[in-house]
């Protein structure tokens, strides 16, 4: 794949992001969380761009050339490569939370089964887990952490709107599941 970068983005910065994505994708593939060409990963490059996995590539076999640049509207920048159909879910996070630097979407068996089991209620509620305190905004294992389970759709604007509605209702969001699909989560680094 040929990737031409805007003059404002140093090649070394893009390469660092691409290498971090490749490394994370391989580790998650080794765990069995990214079967074949499923899943997608991205990292913020600057205020207007992100590096993201190209569509249709086996995540355990990625190389630097399998990472492309997009703008935060989800458009390819400087390449004819095609990003994931779910790119809008990544860019939504970067636009909403400028401090977020990475988005991970995986398809582990556990996530997929949990999404099916809890889809009817629309949410998984976690309480009593000591590790909850490691999540921003949660100071006690007695707090209730909700992870929404959104209905699956191939119409990304609909899914983006569901995520927005959750947030506009004032609910905290650190991850979400898509029914029968997988999880999206994000953070300040890969």
What are these regions (language model features)?
Residues 1-190:
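Glycine-rich flexible loops
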């Amino acid at each position: 794949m040929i990737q031409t970068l805007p003059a404002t983005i140093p090649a070394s910065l893009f390469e660092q992001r691409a290498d971090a994505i490749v490394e994370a994708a391989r580790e998650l593939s080794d765990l069995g969380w990214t079967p074949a060409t499923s899943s997608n990963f991205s990292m913020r490059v600057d205020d207007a761009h992100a590096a993201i996995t190209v569509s249709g590539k086996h995540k355990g076999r990625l190389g630097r050339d399998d990472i492309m640049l997009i703008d935060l509207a989800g458009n390819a920048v400087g390449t004819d490569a095609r990003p994931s159909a779910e790119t809008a879910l990544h860019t939504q996070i970067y636009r909403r939370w400028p401090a977020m630097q990475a988005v991970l979407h995986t398809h582990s068996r556990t996530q997929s089964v949990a999404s099916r089991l809890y889809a009817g209620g629309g949410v998984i509620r976690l309480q009593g887990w000591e590790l909850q305190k490691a999540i921003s905004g949660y100071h006690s294992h007695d707090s209730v952490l909700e992870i929404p389970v959104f209905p699956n759709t191939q119409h990304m604007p609909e899914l983006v709107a569901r995520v927005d509605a959750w947030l506009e209702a004032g609910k905290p969001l650190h991850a979400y599941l898509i029914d029968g699909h997988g999880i999206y989560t994000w953070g300040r680094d890969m």
